[in-house]
Every structure is written in C-alpha cells, then in structure tokens.
Amino acid sequence: MSKQSERLFEAISHLNDEMIDPALEPRKKRKKGRWAALAACFCLVVGVVTGRIPLLGGRSSQPVSGADGAITFQSYAGPVLPMTLREENKNITAQRAITLDFAPWVPVWDEELELGRYDDHILVTDAYTLTNHGETDQDITLLYPFVTSLHSLELPVLTVDGSEVETDLYLGSYAGAFEGGGGLLEGEEGGSINLDATESWENYRDLLSDGSYLARALGTAPDVSGISVTVYQFTDPYAPEDRGETSNPTIRAAFDLDYNKTRVLTYGFHACRYDPESGAMVQGFSIPEERESNYGEPFYLLVIGEDIKNLTVGGYIAGGVDEDTPQLEGCGVTVERYESDLDTMLREVLTRMTNGRETQVDFELYYRVVLEQLLAYGGLTAQEKSRYSSGWLEDVASDAEGIQRVCWLETQVTVPAGGSLTVTVSMEKEASYDYSCDRANQGTRGYDLVTTLGSNLTCTEQTATLEDRGQIEILWQNFGFDLDAGIKTVELEAETEHYFLTVRRADS
C-alpha cells in the first residue's frame, strides 16, 4: 500500500469520526423471539405506537403493548413535535393550541367505483401565540419539526397572523436502526441486512433530547472533495446479435483487493460476490437492450484507497455471479480508468440516477442525505451495515429517499415589544397502524404528540381540540376527551411528555 493510499484511508477514517454524530448510532435493539424475527423477514419496516387508557364503552381486548404500556403498531408514523427556536429567547413565551381534525375520514362518494371512500390520515393545526415580554422587538428564527420520508414528503404550511410565509427546509438523518434477516433465536445477535424503523416515541426522545441531531441537520454538509477516487468507467457493452437461448447476457468484472485498504462503490451493477478472506470481488451487470432505460448509460466502479488489481472483464450467458456460469463469446465493453474525487463522482452518479425523475427536494439536499447515509452506514465507515456490503450506490440512494427522518421548516418573525403574533402550522398527519392483526383489532389507527421534546420554547399553556366529525370511536387515550360528554378541548400538562389517541371508525 502506497503512502498516498495510506493517507487517503487515514483521511476517510478521520472524516467519518467528525461527520458521524452520536445521534446516528443505531438505537439499541430489544431482543426478539423467533416468531418476531420471522415476522421481520416479511416486513422491513416495523413500528410501535402509543398508549392505553380505555374509556367507557371501549373494547375489553387490547393489542399487544410495549414495555412502557404503549400499544404496539407495526407501522409507527411518529409523533407531532413542538416548535422550537434556533436560539433560545427568554423574552418569548407561547400558548400552543393543537387541533386533531378527522375531516379526511368523512366518506366521499366515488361515482366511478359507486362506493364511499375515505382516508385515514388527519389534519393537524398546531398554533402558537408568541408573546414578547421584553421592552424591544425580538427577531427570532422558528424551527418546526415533522416526521416524514422524502418519498412521502408533504411540507406543512406556516402562516403568521393568517398570511403564509416562506420557509427553508432542513433534513435530519436516518431515525431508525438495522436488523437481521430473521430466524434468530432468543439471545442471538442480529445482523444489519434490513432497515428497522423507529418503533415508538421514545426512539424520537432518544434522538432529539440532547440537541445533536438538530445541530447536525442545521450544520454544513460533509465535504468529500478531498477523497480521491480511481474510476473504472464501463461504456458501450455489447452481446452477439445471435444470442441463441441466452436471454440475459451479462458483463462481469472480477478483481483482487485488500478489503482493509480498499473500498469499492458502484453504479449500474446489480450482481456481486465478495470474499474478504481470499481478497476477491466480482461485480456484474446485464447488457442493456435499446428499449431499456439504462441503454447508453455508463457503469462505474469507484475505488477508494489502494487500487484494485488483476481486473478481468468477460461476458456470461446469464446474470448473477455463480462461478460455474458459462462464458459467452462475442461480448465486449469499453473500460476507461481515470482519477477523480468522491464529491464529483457522487454528484455525477446521482444526476444520472435522478434524470427525468423528481426527488421531492432540490438536488443539494438530495445529494446531502445520500452522502450522509453513505458515510454513516455505507462502505466508508468501519460500522458498515451488511445492507450496503455490495457497494451499490443505488441501494444507499433508495434508502435515503425511503427512510423516516425528522425534518424542520425554518422561518423568521419579529415579535413586537410587549406584543404578540400567532404562528399556525397546518399539515396532514399519517396514522400508525398494523399491517395484519386479529379481527377484533382491525381498523385501529393511532395518532400521538409530544409536549416539550426537542423544544426550547416556553409554553405557558397547551390545549388540544378533537374534531371527530362523528367518524370515530375512541379506544385508548390519555388526552381526556369524552365524546359522549361533549368534552373535545382539553388542557395538556407539560409534565406529561407524550399524549396518544387510538381510534377506529365509528361504524366498523
């Protein structure tokens, strides 16, 4: 290994120490029995949602509860989170009034289907009357957090005294963990082949309580322009015109490397065999036809650290990387080797990856979340997850778009001396739910909120209002709503960190 390569790898290690915030460390996993592990094989995203306080008229049977007594849902949508200030200001206090509106549950007649349809999300209005107790005007920067993925990103709308304001978007990192593929017995260590989404509001408490997760989101993006990359670009692959019975001719690149000194990332490859003990790796891709979207696109092997050795390229009659697959005569590809850097090549790859496709956020934000996922869990860290062992950048980018994260909208307001203004946040809130459950618990949906988590804004009063629209039956809650008695607005206590509401349709 050359001194230059050693310096590169030292730089990579140093870079990750600085970039990877403790908040990115996967949360500690609870041990699962065999049945739970087997269930994880079929469902990559597992979740838990909130609470249990049955009201009069509620069901006697209840879904499985977590360790804290929370009702366990397989998909947890995350809580409604409170507004905070970029910099704490003792002159500013707030009165918070949150409304949970079940208007989307009202059936709407579909003429084409000849039936009523409805959604199971709700509308949330989270209003803050900000009061300035100081003797001078206060210019403050507001941050409003919300839980989402880029795939399902719908930005909340912020208004100040009724007028919509412009906002800037900040994205947090992956909020979940990783888990094995299943089949583990109690006490066995799991793997990291699957994503394991946040399971409860406590996961968000652990994520947000010390402020480091937010600080990372507000900070500057990692700079990897100083990481040198040796690029192997594969272009113009071809197969014989007469393929015979060969339906999937494939190009394979086989090479040797020292896994302790070299990292390989790829774009366009979709078959891989790696063997750290023997120091060998094989990467492959199907030769595209003209009708396919990747026809004419380059394929990349990106080598970081010490260069690979003994590269051989050949054509094979089928996909995969089985050693006994026969070779196919008449195949070929142009391979060009050149030097670049990780920033340039990642931008090149992501530009090609998103060509003609919307990414929900601008390119710089998209680039950043993919890079942070790669640096935290991909091949550039000693804590690499087996999910990314192939080095395929498509996997990292796909996860970066699909994983759940906390995001923030930022805006600036001026609260006059001795005066007040009202900031209102309006958004849709998805339900927490089960993919499958017994008949008695079918149709159960959960919604929850937290009062102070991650916020430095002093709320002198918090209230919650339920607009049930006559559509729901309350099963479990700790708000204190009573539909029969007409109690639909309640005062929340700051000492109660977490409030939850579990319902189903009134006519179910």
What are these regions (language model features)?
Residues R52-S508:
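Lumenal/extracellular ectodomains and adaptor appendage modules
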Residues D17, P26, V46, G57-G58:
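Generic detector of low-complexity/intrinsically disordered segments
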Residues K28-P54:
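Internal signal-anchor transmembrane helix that establishes type II topology
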Residues S5, K32-A37, H121, L457:
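A broadly tuned, weak detector of single residues within folded domains
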Residues M1-Q4, F42, V64:
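Intrinsically disordered, low-complexity segments enriched in Ser/Pro/Gly/Ala and basic residues
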Residues M1-R30:
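Disordered, charged N-terminal biogenesis/targeting segments of membrane/secreted proteins
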